[in-house]
Amino acid sequence: MVIARKGNFGSTNVCAIPDQPITAYVAGDDGSEMPAYVVYRHKGQPPFDWRSAQFREMTFVSPSATNSGLKSTDPALLAEVVALLRDGTPMSLPGISMAGGASMATIRMASDQLPGLLFCPVLRTGPDGTLYVAESLKFDFTSTPLLFQANWIPASPKLTQWLQSR
């Protein structure tokens, strides 16, 4: 639902997020040629803490995988992803180009503590074929060319098996 319009160049939408009060979160269209919605959190709204959230479902999404759309509601697997991100040891991997960042795979995790929004850790395969997961990507403005960086954690055998299933 559009709740406002913004912008000096044309008109872009500010929208309510289903199941979220507009005093907590809204989505704004920050795209230029096409819609690109970004979530904005009110400064008085505490940040979502994925480390302590109870997730109910996760979906693997990848532009290039044949099993994109793979879902799980297994509480043990969901807890393993959170524990891996929270407690795992990050590895240093080469940065990812902007073009490569556009095709990154994610795990979309849904929680009743954040209705209408998702926590989306990113995935990649390392040079040695190992699967890695990270909480988020960071844009490195100091590199040439510009690259995405992350704190990459090797995926557990159970997570790797689930991601390769189907």
Regions found by a protein language model. Name each.
Residues 1-166:
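Function-determining sites in protein domains
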